[in-house]
């Protein structure tokens, strides 16, 4: 399920609302038979805060959510986002937070666009345990300096410069065997009728996955 947002750096009132919303979302997951929910840390980071403090705050927030999610049999997938204002911007930062949390029901949502847009390198994936990878989003990304790509520059696989085959082979090497879905933010794609978008997603993903699995 996509997504529970702004789970860290919450004021007291916001924290109470988050608890109520998360309980509702986790209950919905159980009714729908959905075992995993995407989590986004925060876009409201205090100015001047250190990376270590962000890690602690995010880990503490995830620990609280983990307890609540466990009551419903739901896993939490933290997504790092290489966009302005995001508190968790890189693969390495996300992996560090997951190490601090160290809960079986808290893992990572790996997005190829954010990975490449944030300047991460394919070899970094070798350090990720397969049991900490819960979801995979795939889209292509143009070659840009780290953190300069625009979110609208999120394309169908094969229409950008991301090493998607290498990345997905590295994901496969972790032992991950879960969902792998297309997530494209190109406004031209978002304007397509749903049926056309689904067909195009299949046309671009099936050949990519076939090459990865050779």
Regions from the PLM with identified roles:
Residues 1:
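Zn-dependent metallopeptidase/amidohydrolase metal-coordination segment
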Residues 4-6, 187:
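Short active-site-proximal "capping" loops at secondary-structure junctions
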Residues 6-107, 117, 193-196, 212:
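Active-site acidic/histidine proton-transfer and metal-coordination neighborhood
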Residues 24-27, 33-35, 88-110, 114-214:
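Histidine-acidic metal/acid-base catalytic patches
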């Amino acid at each position: 399920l996509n997504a529970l947002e702004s789970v860290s750096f919450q004021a007291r009132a916001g924290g109470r609302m988050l608890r109520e919303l998360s309980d509702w979302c986790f209950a919905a997951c159980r009714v729908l038979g959905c075992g995993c929910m995407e989590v986004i840390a925060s876009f409201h980071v205090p100015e001047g805060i250190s990376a270590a403090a962000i890690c602690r705050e995010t880990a503490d927030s995830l620990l609280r959510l983990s307890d609540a999610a466990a009551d419903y049999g739901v896993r939490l997938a933290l997504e790092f986002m290489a966009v302005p204002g995001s508190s968790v911007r890189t693969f390495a930062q996300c992996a560090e937070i997951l190490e601090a949390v160290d809960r079986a029901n808290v893992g990572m949502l790996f997005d190829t666009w954010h990975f490449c847009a944030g300047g991460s390198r394919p070899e970094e994936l070798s350090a990720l345990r397969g049991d900490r990878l819960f979801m995979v989003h795939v889209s292509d990304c143009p070659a840009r300096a780290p953190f300069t790509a625009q979110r609208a520059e999120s394309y169908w696989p094969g229409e950008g410069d991301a090493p998607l085959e290498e990345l997905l082979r590295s994901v496969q090497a972790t032992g991950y065997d879960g969902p792998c879905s297309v997530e494209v933010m190109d406004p031209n794609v978002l304007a397509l009728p749903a049926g056309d978008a689904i067909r195009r997603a299949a046309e671009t993903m099936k050949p990519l996955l076939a090459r990865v699995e050779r």
